[in-house]
Structure formats: C-alpha cells, structure tokens
C-alpha cells in the first residue's frame, strides 16, 4: 500500500491537496491524530484482499507536541508494515497566510483567546518543523492558486507512482522572490536578455523567436551544457537514495524569457535521454 502523509501550515492548501489526491484515486482522511495513524494503517491492510492500495491522511498541529516529537517513530512503525509512506508538506509565506485567513474568516486551529493570528502561525510553523524536515516533497503555495495547486499535485503524485524519479523544472523571476520548494536553484540572469529586444518583449521563452534569439549566443548553449552535465552527474545519486521527487528551479529577472527557455530545454532533454517522469512549471507565466 502507498500512503501519503499530507501536512503543512494552516491556509497553505492541505484540503486542496487531499481533494486532488482523492480525485486521483486515493482513499483520504483529514485531520487524523498522529497517535491513531499506525492503527489506521493496520486496519487498511487487515483484509486478505485490501480495499485500498492508495491512501492519504491529513495531519496537522492538533496532534499535539508529544505525538509530533514521536513522528519519526510513528513513520518507522508504518514503514515496518511494508507501507510505501511519503510525506507531502505545504507552506506559504506568512503575509499570504494572514491574507487568506482574513479573506476566508476561518479560525486558526491554535487560535486561543488573546493570541494574535500571527503568533498562532509562528507557533504552528515551529511545531510542524518536525514533519517539514522529513518531507519527501515540499510545495510552496505562496504564488499558487487552488486550480494550479490541484494540477501540480496530480502531476507530481501520478508521476511518482512508479520507481522513477519525478523531476520538475521550474522557472521563476528573482524580482518576485526565490522559490523555497527547490532542491537546486540556478541563476541565469547572466545570459543575454530578450526583454531588451522590443519585438521579443511581450513573448516568452516558449516562443520560437525567443529561442532563436537565445540560440544565437554561444554562452546560452554553454549554460545549458553545464546545467545538463551537472544534473546528469548528480541525479543518479539522488535516485540511489530512493528520492521520489526533485525540483530544479531556474531564475532570471522576470521569469518570462531565459529561465523559461532553459527549463523547457532541460525538461525535453531528460525526457528523451533518461526516460524520467519530467514536468515543467513556469511560475510567473501562471
């Protein structure tokens, strides 16, 4: 049986994630106390013909400090039962979480009389750090809406259904902030910028004219070759450690031209040469 533990900060999209997993065929339970998790798994595996081969459980801070402190032991017990267990952790910037709570008027699970929302968020972040550091996949939803998050989770989880690494190439613009849900971040702002060509300014790195412009510069090919060789060298090492997910982020100034172009080229290369499960996400084009 495959089990995904869905955790993260309140307001970061855990319910959206569980809904997406349910649509993908997972049996989902939200807000399960950590102390009940092992028994829950045993029940799912008890029948001679198990009813559920895919399950997902939402776990939040309400499990309490004692159970959170024993998270590693709980996960070890589950894996000892032969379960393929993965951890999905969602986060978002504090100002975005505050805005979401203001818009939805939902109450934070740690909110107590006299405790400001910002303090509840910071306490939650501290308590859930025990889970966050063990996450197989971390998604930053700061700049992601409900529909984008749904598609992103479906893509990553379905791709990780086999033994192959699920590899995401993500473009972004540094002026909008660096993504924190990355395994590698590469700065490509040193490359020639199509933005300064009036005919290319409104286009993106997906457009042939932008690609042709960048292909004219030898330094762009050199950058691609260097990134390709680096990833070819080190991806097998991550696979050897049984990693299910990897996110490679490439950033230029605005996230429209150079980073998009390189993300697409690298994704095409690794799809063709290694047969990996590869997807792309262009944060600023969303």
Curated annotation (Swiss-Prot):
Binding-site residues, GTP: 60-63
UniProt xrefs under InterPro entries: P-loop_NTPase (IPR027417), RapZ-like (IPR005337), RapZ-like_N (IPR053930), RapZ_C (IPR053931)
Keywords attached to this entry: ATP-binding, GTP-binding, Nucleotide-binding
Residues engaged in binding ATP: 8-15
Gene3D superfamilies on file: P-loop containing nucleotide triphosphate hydrolases
A GO term for molecular function: GTP binding
HAMAP family linked to this entry: RapZ_like (MF_00636)
Family classification: Belongs to the RapZ-like family.
NCBIfam families: PRK05416.1 (NF003828)
Function: Displays ATPase and GTPase activities.
Protein known as: Nucleotide-binding protein Tgr7_0722
Protein species of origin: Thioalkalivibrio sulfidiphilus (strain HL-EbGR7)
